Amino acid sequence: MYDQLQSIEDRYEELGELLSDPAVISDTKRFMELSKEEANTRETVEVYRRYKQVVEGISDAEELLSENLDAEMAEMAKEELSDLKKEKEVLEDRIKILLLPKDPNDDKNIIMEIRGAAGGDEAALFAGDLFNMYQKYAEAQGWKAEVLEANVTGIGGYKEVIMMISGDNVFSKLKYESGAHRVQRVPSTESQGRIHTSTATVVVMPEAEEVEIELADKDIRVDIYHASGAGGQHVNKTASAVRLTHLPTGIVVAMQDERSQLKNREKAMKVLRARVYDQIQQEAQSEYDANRKSAVGTGDRSERIRTYNFPQNRVTDHRIGLTIQKLDQILAGKLDEIIDALVLYDQTSKLEEMQNG
């Protein structure tokens, strides 16, 4: 482990030198790649450097205690030694987590699809609540959220909304959101005050770059048609809506939000590439899960992952048994408590899996 840490530190120092090299600075693509690599290793190096200081401090304190000290000095040295040993344990745990294999998709942007499922109008309204929640969370993180396609219902909900969220490490935080989200509340139209249960589904996919997945033109059928539905004045005037069908997988993506056929096609390609890439990832994950139990369910899209209970202001994440009485804050985009708990659970499970062989 320590040889690995030392090689990471050596590479970090090398990156520092490279990033001040005029030849690298003038090559924007390489400079960005190396900057990203440096940023990804910085925390590991900082923790390792502190660890080395602590180990040295323990050695010094033990050496000091082996000498003839007066009672007060001996007590101070013992106290310092005790504190340093505790810190060493904490740092060792952090190092183990930092050295866990990284999900190669963690630093990617995402495409998120939210759909009203069981529950009709109430499900569509809840899909809208989730959409707003993720938008607010993205804003708080300093990310950019862009709507690619929205199918709005007459009462202000969403049958379906697709958005792209861009920024630093988006997938690493939002990958746990895929699954069925259940809501329990009294609809505004319910005169008897009965609680209704509805469901919305969320799918989170890493954005796939062209270099990662190449979609051959011969494998894509393109259909152009007139926009319909809540498209406003340009409905049926121009054939701007685009439907792409990936023939090998049967995946279909339709876009009509933009007036421009070209823009709709660009957006549709983004979503299609992400869906095909995601299907490949899901198949690989299913194969892995068949041999080993996955820590936190990030794959099974039918899995009920969370319940939002309005009368009790309660949110429960069923995967980790976490219940929080702050539904109003969570729907306002304050998701950190849930996401941090999911990340920690996932990391702890992976550590246990590694230790158990």
Swiss-Prot record:
- Keywords associated with the record: Cytoplasm, Methylation, Protein biosynthesis
Q: Taxonomically, which superkingdom?
A: Bacteria
Q: Where in the cell is it found?
A: Cytoplasm
Which residues are modified to N5-methylglutamine?
233
Q: What is one term from the GO cellular component aspect held by the record?
A: cytoplasm
A single Pfam family it belongs to is RF-1
Q: Which InterPro entries match?
A: PCRF (IPR005139), Pep_chain_release_fac_I (IPR000352), Pep_chain_release_fac_I_sf (IPR045853), Prokaryotic/Mito_RF (IPR050057), RF-1 (IPR004373)
A GO MF term: translation release factor activity, codon specific
State the post-translational modifications. Answer: Methylated by PrmC. Methylation increases the termination efficiency of RF1.
The main location is cytoplasm
| Family membership noted in the UniProt record | Belongs to the prokaryotic/mitochondrial release factor family.
Query: Entry's NCBIfam families?
Result: prfA (TIGR00019), PRK00591.1 (NF001859)
Q: What does this protein do?
A: Peptide chain release factor 1 directs the termination of translation in response to the peptide chain termination codons UAG and UAA.
This chain belongs to the protein called: Peptide chain release factor 1
Q: Could you tell me which species this protein originates from? A: Enterococcus faecalis (strain ATCC 700802 / V583)
Which gene is the coding source of this polypeptide chain? prfA
